[in-house]
Every structure is written in structure tokens, then in C-alpha cells.
Amino acid sequence: MREMKIKSIILCALALSGAAACTKLNVKEAPEYVAPLYIQASDSKVVFDVTGGQAMITLASNGKVSSGEVPEGFELQEEEGATYIVKAGVNTGAETVSGELVFTAVRGEETAQAKVSLVQRAGEAKNLSAEGLANCYIAHTQGTYRFNATVKGNGKGDGGSDYIKNYGVNIEGGTRATLIWEARHDGDRSLTYEVIDGAPVYHNGYITFSTGRSEGNALIAIEDIHGEVLWSWHIWVTNNPVTAHDHILPDLEGNPKVVAQIMDRNLGAMNNEPMNLENRGMFYQWGRKDPFLPSRTPYRTNGYPDINEPEDNEINSEIGDGTRPWDVFATNTAPKVSTNPGNIPYSVKYPNKHIEQFSAQSLYTWYVSSVDKKDISVTKVKLWDETKTIFDPCPAGYKVPGGKLYANFGNVDVNNPRDLTGGKPDEYTEDFHWLWEKFENCGRVWKPTGDFYPVVGTFVPMRGEDYVYNHYTGELGMYWTTSPNTYQEGESAYYEYEWIRMNEAAAFSGYGAMVYACQIRCIKE
């Protein structure tokens, strides 16, 4: 009986399996995803000055692209790869010429459009480089400007780096101007696009650009035919005139002595008002010409109960109509080189990239990965120097300050009052001897002149982080000078430079590594 039951179960199982084998499952395959039709222009607006020029417009689309009617006063030339060259001749009239280019993408019965506004001013653009060549030009809102884009920096020396010998001082092979980024201090995304108005134009060795209705900072570059950056310029848009005045340092007998003519604010700031977000300048790695943005977080009015809290250091990553997002990974090391001109060519090519030190080395520099201590030509390089170089980030007529503008410096011991130029708040009496006033309003005042110096923090990666962030905004201030470290021995000393460091507890002249990004208060050449 048991055997018959088992046999019956086996037969049933076989029958079921056979039935399953003969049954065809009716499963519908999911339809292949098809992306919506799109078309996007590299620029939404191009602005020419009265002399005209040409600009390149690139279209990205998953359809077949064609151009529409060309507005009167402009020409359009089609290139390979959905690229067009728009040209404007000399505007001989008294009025601004404007129009609109319409590009259409077609796929089957679908269509999509991208529109590009074209504007040509009737007035001649102001030549910013007429007052001197530089890596930074100051402009006002709602103006049209141009500058010489055939020379690197001020064209006058490379700090002994051999860069000019290897790469020259003239810019060759430039075909197009591009906006790398534009930004406001507050990071307002809607107004960030209003710093630069339209795309910059390269013509006959000059870059022409127009400013919008918003103050801020921007970076404009010249590229070759392959889109590689050949050089770039910081555009500082402020309606508050930048001025200079006496910087006073008492001599050993306490007598006031004018040692420089100093700028009225930090490089890239809109003002120098205590507790004002716009008193923050741009950040610079030592020796580099291209800036990084300060935090967008307002200063705390009630102090900082916790040190270096993330909410007090929000990063400003806006680029507006720029073409290159910020590249601030903490793993961004440059190629491994040990000879001059180091990684200057790499830094020129990637002005939006923060370059870190090589983790296997103790040099704390972006310049080289290793160095022969006996090779003075490498260890004594001064990319920023007492005499202005092509890498100096200050506007024409200004330069990065030299050393000893804020008292003599040396091997500073912050616990030794004799080495300090500013102390703790409770150490100040009516006859205090410090050169810096006590810490107030997120900054300190230089007593001999009354100049305010905001503590803007720094821009550097912290251990264990994947990105470079703003740190210690409103709590710590660091200002670069050109002076190298001369007192230490060992590799680290070769790439340390004087900075003015201040917080609530102290102020002093010390030394910092090249990879740090700090503030600059320019002085007259």
C-alpha cells in the first residue's frame, strides 16, 4: 500500500512538471527607454563691443540641429560637431544692435529649440589693460570692458621658476574666450547669473565682456581650439571704488613709519565693513593667481559657541553661467614633478581646481612632489616676490605684500607674549602695547592706522574629508605675504611662507604651507 502511494506521488509530480514544461509564459518585455528630445546652447547671450568680433556657440542635442534666420548685422558660420561661429562687424551706428538666433533640434515629429541673444554695443568698451597688465581687473556693474589677452599676467618675471623660459610670456593659439565662473558673496543663485552679462568675446588679441546688475567676482579664460585653458583673469566687479592709503608700522623706538600704500579692503571684497558678509576677499593658494570663494554663511552676531561648526562655513559653489564646476576634491594632487617650473602649467590649465599636497611627502606644497634639497633653483622659487611676477593675483599697480609689514617675524611661540602682536580680550588695558586691537566683530583693527581685518577663515581640506571646505569663518584670519620661511631646516621649510594669523586669543606673524588658501591685502607696487 505504501509503495502504491509513493508511486502515485511520483506520477503526479511528473505530470505537473510536464505540464509546466509545455506551458509558455506570456511575459511582456519593458519598452526601451528613449530620452526626451533636448537641445542646449553653450551660451544664452553673446555681447560684442562696437568693434565686433566672433564667438563660438556649441549645441548639445540628441536630435538633428539646424539654425534659423540670422539677425541683421550678424553672420553665422557652421562648423563641425554642432558648432557655430557668430560674427559681428564694426557697429557704425549710434544705437545698440540686437537680435536672436534660434536653433532647432528635430527627431521624427518632435522639435525643440534653443535661443541665443545677440547684442552689439554702440559705444567702445573700456580698455582695462590700458592702465597696466595684470591677472585681476576691476570693473563696475552694467558696463562693457576689454583687456589685452595676449600676455600672461603683467609679463614681467616668473620668480625664478623657469616658466617663461619653457612656456613663454605671450599667449599663443587662443581661439575663444569663456566664462569659467561667476559668483556673489551670498551665493544667491538667481543673482549669480547677473555678475557677467552674456558670454565674453575674443577678437584681435582682446577679450571683451559686459557686466550685469550684480556686484561679485568672476573668472574669464582664453582657450585654444581644443578647449584647453591657456590663461585666465579674475574680474572683480564692485561699484565701491578701490583705494589705497598709508600703512604704518612703528619702528623699534615706537615712532610711526609709513612702510607701504595698502589697499582699503581684501582682494575681491566689496567693502571693509565689520560683520558685513561682503568684506570677505577671495582665497589664494600661495603662488597661484586664480581665486577660490569664501563661505556664503553670514557672520554670527552672538559669537561662536562651537569651534568650526559646518553650519558656519557653508561653501559657495555657484558658477552662474560659467562653464566649469568647482573641482575641490581633497585628493586633487597634480602630476608628480620635481623640477622647475613644477606644476605651474597644471595650475594654469585648471584654474577651478584646488591642488593638494602629495600625501607621501612632507612638503605641503602643490608645486612639486619631491625636491633635492641641494637644488637651490627649485627650493628658492618665489612665485610671488618683492618684484611683481606674472603669477601675482593683485590688480595693476598693486602686488602681494612683502614681509615685515606687521612687525618683525621669526620662530613664533604663541605662548610667549614677546612674539605676539595681539592678545586676548582681557589682556587689553588703556595703555596696551599690542599693535592689533582686541578681537571684535569677527576681526581685528591694526592700531597704527585703524584698518579693519576680517577673519574670513581658510579654504583647505581637513583630515578624513573628501572635499575641500571653508573652515573657521569668523573665527580665524590668515593673510599671505611674499616672504619665505628662513628659520627652519628640513624639507617643509622650503615651501612655507609668512602669513599674518589672528583669532580671539592672539595675533602674530607666522608661516604657512603653500597648499593653504588664505586672504590677501594688496599693496601698491
Regions found by a protein language model. Name each.
Residues V46-G52:
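Short, solvent-exposed loop/linker segments at the N-terminal edge
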Residues N127-L128, G132-I171, G227-M282:
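GGW-centered surface loops in extracellular recognition modules
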Residues D246-D372, G402-K404:
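A short glycine-rich, aromatic-capped structural motif
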Residues K5-I6, L16-S42, G108, A112-K115, ...:
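Bacterial Sec-dependent N-terminal signal peptides
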Residues Q54-I85, A125-T208:
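Surface-exposed binding patches on compact interaction domains or structured appendages
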Residues E95-G108, E215-I225:
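A short beta-strand micro-motif common to beta-rich folds, especially ectodomain repeats
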Residues T83-S98, Y202-E215:
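Extracellular/luminal low-complexity segments enriched in Ser/Thr/Pro
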